[in-house]
A protein has these predicted regions:
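An accessory alpha-helical subdomain
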Residues: 91-151
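Short alpha-helical segments enriched in small residues
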Residues: 1-93, 110-119, 147-325
Length: 325
C-alpha cells in the first residue's frame, strides 16, 4: 500500500519489474493516471489516450479501467477501482502462460520426443506426468514470447484423436456427454462407488448420470444386473465374463448410452493364488461395442480402487473417439 506522495513507489516499481513475473497494481480512479505516469517513467515510455484513458503506450491490452503491460520479465495489470463500484476486468490471467493437456494411448518417451521439437518452435516448456499406462497429463508453461495455443494445435495434428486440451478430464467428459445428449451409468464392485463419486463431485453430473449400482455380493450382481448365476459360479465375480454382463446389465437397467463395470480384489485380503490382491477386470460398453481390460495392480486398497477408477475413465474416453476427440 502506497500513498500518492510516497517517493519510494518509483523504486518499488522498478524492483518489481525486474523480479516479478506477474504484478497487479490496484489504484483509485484519482491516482490511475499518476500510476501510469510513474510506470511510463520507469519503462521509458509516454502516456497516450486509449479508450478515454491516459495509459502507457506500451499497454497493448486494455478494457475500461484496466490495462496490461509487458516490461522486462513482468506482466503488469493496472486496475482502477473505487469502493461501491464493480471491479474492472482482471486481464492478467494464467491461461496465457499455462495450460494442461491429456494424451491417451501414447507412452511417455514417445510423447516427450513428439512434443520436444514443438516446444522449441513455439517457445514453451512442458512436463509429462504419467497418470496410468496410456494416459499422460502434460503441464505446459509459456516462455516470454511463447504461444501455448499454437503449440497445442500443432500437437493435436501430430496426435490425432489422442489429445484432449483440459485441466479437468471429468468436467470435460460431462460437457461432451451433455452436448451430445448422452448418458452414462456405472456398475461397481471393488471400487464401492468411487467412480460415481468422481463424476457426482462436479456440477452438471445430474445431466448425464441418472444413477449407478454398487453390487458387492453375487446375489445383487444376479438380481440387479442380471449376471447369470452359472457364469458367477463357473468364473467367479472377478472375471471378464462377469464384468461383460455387469456393463450390459447396467445399461439395460439405466437405459444409458455408456455402461462401465468394475470388479476386482482391492485387498488387503481376499486374494488367491490364481487371483491375487490387485486383480481387477473393467468393462466399458456402448450400444454397439464392448471393451474389457484385465489389470494386475500393486498397492494398498486405496491405490487399487483409485487406479481402477482411472482406468475406467480412460477406457470411456477411448471407446468413443468420435465424440471425445
Amino acid at each position: 500500500h502506497f500513498k500518492e506522495s510516497d517517493n519510494s513507489l518509483l523504486l518499488f516499481l522498478e524492483e518489481e519489474f525486474n523480479s516479478s513475473n506477474k504484478l497487479i497494481i490496484v489504484t483509485t480512479k484519482h491516482n490511475f493516471s499518476t500510476i501510469g505516469k510513474m510506470i511510463s517513467t520507469v519503462t521509458s515510455d509516454n502516456q497516450v489516450l486509449k479508450d478515454q484513458m491516459l495509459i502507457p503506450s506500451k499497454a497493448d491490452k486494455y478494457v475500461k479501467d484496466s490495462y496490461l503491460l509487458e516490461y522486462k520479465k513482468s506482466l503488469t495489470n493496472v486496475i482502477s477501482m473505487d469502493e461501491m463500484k464493480k471491479m474492472p476486468k482482471i486481464l492478467l490471467t494464467s491461461e496465457k502462460n499455462h495450460a494442461t493437456i491429456n494424451i491417451f494411448e501414447e507412452d511417455r518417451e514417445s510423447a516427450n520426443a513428439l512434443l520436444n521439437s514443438l516446444a522449441q518452435m513455439h517457445e514453451v516448456s512442458f512436463e509429462v506426468i504419467t497418470i496410468i499406462e496410456g494416459w499422460l497429463r502434460v503441464e505446459i508453461a509459456s516462455k516470454r514470447y511463447g504461444n501455448i495455443s499454437n503449440f497445442i494445435d500443432s500437437a493435436k495434428q501430430l496426435l490425432p484423436r489422442k489429445l484432449i486440451s483440459t485441466a479437468n478430464i471429468i468436467e470435460y467428459i460431462i460437457k461432451v456427454l451433455d452436448a451430445n445428449n448422452k448418458k452414462i451409468s456405472f456398475a461397481e464392485s471393488c471400487t464401492g462407488g468411487l467412480l460415481s463419486y468422481y463424476f457426482t463431485s462436479h456440477n452438471g453430473a445430474s445431466k448425464i448420470l441418472d444413477g449407478s449400482l454398487i453390487t458387492y455380493s453375487n446375489d445383487l450382481k444376479d438380481n440387479w444386473l442380471a449376471v447369470e448365476h452359472d457364469v458367477l459360479e463357473e468364473y467367479g465375480a472377478v472375471s471378464s465374463q462377469v464384468v461383460e454382463q455387469m456393463s450390459e446389465g447396467v445399461i439395460n437397467v439405466s437405459h444409458a448410452d455408456y455402461g462401465l463395470s468394475i470388479s476386482g480384489i482391492a485387498g488387503d485380503t481376499g486374494g488367491t493364488e490364481l487371483k491375487p490382491v490387485g486383480t481387477v477386470y473393467i468393462g466399458v460398453r456402448t450400444k454397439t461395442t464392448h471393451q474389457e481390460v484385465h489389470l494386475h495392480l500393486h498397492g494398498d486398497r486405496n491405490y487399487v480402487q483409485q487406479q481402477s477408477a482411472l482406468y475406467a475413465i480412460k477406457m470411456l474416453v477411448t471407446i468413443d473417439k468420435e465424440i471425445f476427440f
